[in-house]
A protein has these predicted regions:
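Strongly charged
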Residues: 1-126
Length: 126
């Protein structure tokens, strides 16, 4: 099934006379935990409760590992890591914890996941 794309018009915020057209994905909804649990249950020997328990534990443990400074590699899926940046200072002495910004979670998809999307097809809708 092709991914549906729509054409949108965007103005340059610095020069409203400059207009370009872009393709963006038409959203078709979202998949929640219950759907994922049901689909995994249907393709495995696990019960829905077992699947949900595993996924819930993963969601709970992921931040624990990341707070320990670990990267989390879910083979075949991808790698999660924390990115921390800070405001710049003129000297190292001025640099304190106060300049640290809130951490962000970065996700890098695995080669397997990227390859799973190579055969994607598109359709432009009007």
């Amino acid at each position: 099934m092709p991914v549906k794309l729509k054409k949108i018009r965007r103005e340059n915020p610095l020069d409203r006379a400059q207009v370009k057209w872009y393709l963006v994905q038409e959203k078709s909804g979202s998949v929640g935990m219950s759907r994922i649990v049901r689909d995994i249950r249907d393709r495995s020997a696990m019960t829905a409760g077992d699947v949900k328990n595993v996924l819930t534990n993963l969601v709970e443990l992921l931040p624990v590992y990341l707070q320990m400074g670990q990267t989390v590699n879910l083979e075949g899926f991808g790698v999660f890591r924390i990115i921390v940046s800070s405001a710049g200072t003129q000297t190292a002495e001025e640099l304190t914890i106060r300049q640290a910004k809130k951490p962000k979670v970065a996700f890098a998809p695995s080669k397997d996941l990227r390859q799973g999307l190579e055969d994607i097809t598109y359709e432009i809708i009007t």
